[in-house]
Structures are given as structure tokens and as C-alpha cells.
Amino acid sequence: HECSSAASDVYKRQDAAHTPLTIKKDNGLIISIHEANLINYSSMTLAPKGNGLLEVELYPWSDGTKVKLDNKITSPWRFIQIADNSSKLLDSDIILNLNEDPDENQDFSWVKPGKYMGVWWEMIGTNESTWWQSQNHGANNSKVKYYLDFASKNNFNGLLVEGWNKGWHPEWCCSGNGDPFSFTESVNDFDINYLSSYGNSIGVNLVGHHETGGQIQNYENQLEDAFKLYNRIGVKNIKTGYVNDVSKNIKKINPEGTVSREWHHGQYMIDHFQKVIETAAKYKLNIIKHEPIKDTGLRRKYPNFISREGAKGQEFNGFSSNGVNHATDLPFTRLLSGPMDYTPGIFQLNNFRYVSPGSDEIDKNAIVPSTIAKELALYVVYYSPMQMAADLPKHYIKHPEAFEFIKSVPVEWSKKNVIDSKISEFV
């Protein structure tokens, strides 16, 4: 989130802020502080020290070391943007300018933008299906085939399917116990070879899904085989997840067999994410990362780092609420760093969530704090080269004109023009 997790055990929530941190001064100046080209280092937060001072805090290793390096220290760039109004803050390429071009021997011409739908909102949003196998399992052959047909008919080129693989169970979230996940074996009511082949034949590639549960060693042990599988069956994009409700709960298995718990935004995870994106490039796969580290512009060198979450996205409106002003905060905080997989496009804004999977009872308290017009505006304001239409087909069918906008709006733009804006109010 744009101002959330603490940087050490002694901090309480919001005693330190992730970057980009945006500040509006009394004289009207808007200041944003961030970092770029974060590789083989630890992520910084900014902690208030009184008298208007902010101090950089690095997420340490479990032994207290801030950064572990072999030969030389190469820190990320730290930079400050200053503008006399909020609109000018949005018109900057500094984060990309502080990163490097791809290596000369790397060809990323295979990276393509697109739009995708997903078997996902009916689990986390409408609560009518489950990730795990049950009579209401979402990732079953007949349902996925229906989604593929609907996506193809409406010119989407991707379909995310969550809950396709072995390891899901009702208590999977969110303790950090992700050890059982397999990233190569599908459950018995999901035929990955048939569905990927069928989707490819009608112009809709499966969007792969790797929820790790924050168990890094389990994922890295399977990384090569998992990416080989996706490359073989024609997957182009993978959404990865690291759901873990405790920030310092990433299990690291040390060479001697002991276990340490590392910070989600520390160097251990920075190195892991780097390994994932480089391995994905080898197999011509794009990564859409959820529960990521912050975007620091690495997409310039690795264009297959196509999008990421990194703030409270639409999913929180499924089981909680982002509030009405959250959407107009993000362009001036999280989105300053790069593309965001917010997953917009929810049209059924109330009477959408069932009390439990298989139930006919509606949770009357569940409301998405939005309007259809606002959901459409997100496709213009929230940049993501791989953009999602997150709602269910049955909800889009009710609103054909609005759905037509989602189908036709670009995901890549040749020019950006910020007409006017005011933080937390409009853009």
C-alpha cells in the first residue's frame, strides 16, 4: 500500500512508509520520493524523525544485517520529484531513465500487450466458487471452456485461471503455509493440455497462475519445470502471488537446514524476484506479480516484467472495502512507480457476494465503492500493458455498451496528457 508496512520490529504500522511517498507542502509544492533500479539490495522505507526529517530504513535480514554483498556496493538510485501541481508530478519518466536497457543479446520482441479475463472474481469477489476442489470448484473444464469462448467472442487474448493446480485447500490463506503447492500438476477436473490447446486455437492463451503462499524454496525448486510447462503449452503471461499476512514471515531454509523468517521486502525477496523475472525471460514468459516488491523501473531492462499489484487492488473490494478516495490516491503514489494490475471493470457493485459458495443467500453488506463510469475511467488512468476485465461474463452481458468500452479501449498509449487533477479527488 502507499503508506503501510513497518521497516523493523520496533515500528508500529505507518511509523514508516513505502515509496513512492508523496507529500503536499503548505506552499503548494508536491514532492515524491522513490528509488530506481533496485537489484541485489534491500528495499527502503522512509521513517519520520521529527522536525520534518525523514530517514531511510532498510528491511534487514533476520540476523540484523541490512545488505549482504560479495565485492562492491551498488545501491539503487534514490530520487526526489518536485512539482508545483499534482498533474505535473504524473508527467515524468525519471524512473525509467535511471534504469538500464536490455542486454544486447536479449530479444524481447515477443513481449506483447493485451487484455484478459479470469476465473477469479467468482472466488474472491462473488464467493460462489472455491479455489480448492469441491462441488463449487471454479477451475473446472466446463466453466473454463465457457470463459474461453466468451473471451474469444469479445476479443480478449488471455484467461487467468486460479485454483488449477494441486495444493489448494480451505485453509490455504494466509499463514505462509504454501508448501503443498505444485506448479506442474493440475487437479483432476482441470485438463491443462486440452484447455490450453483449445484456448490457443481460438486466440485466447491461458494466463498462468502461481500462488506461492510465500514459500520461496518450494517455488524455486519447481521454477524451471513450471516455466518449461507453460512455454510448451503456449502460456504467455503468468500471475504470481505471495499471499502472507505477516510481513516478516518469509520462510528461508538455510544450507545447514535451519529456518529463518525474512521480511517480504528485504534483500532475500529482492533476489528471489530477480531470479523469477530472469528465468521467465529465458522461457519467453511475462510476469504479472502480486504481493510484489515496489516497482523501481526494471521493466526497462526486463520488458517481460509487464505489470504488478503493489497496493490495495480491486480484490479488497470483494471482501472488504478500499473506500471512495483510494482510487484517486493511487495515481499520485503507487502508480508513479509503474504499471499496476489493479484488476478493474467490476459492473455488479452490490448484491454480488454470496454468504458462502453454493449458498443462495446474498451478503447485503458487500458493496464495491464505485460506479460503472468510475470502473471504465480506471482503464484510462491506471496503466497496465496486460489489463484485466475482472467481472463475470454474466455481469458484462447486462451492460453491453459499457462492456464495449472495455473491449475497445487501448492498453498502450503513444502520448499522455494530464488535463487536471487534485490528489484524493480527481484526475
Segments and roles (model prediction):
Residues 391-427:
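Glycan-recognition and catalytic regions of carbohydrate-active enzymes
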Residues 151, 287, 381:
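Conserved, mostly hydrophobic/aromatic
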Residues 9-210:
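Conserved structural scaffold segments of CAZyme catalytic domains across common CAZy folds
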Residues 72, 110, 140, 144, ...:
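Active-site-proximal structural scaffolding
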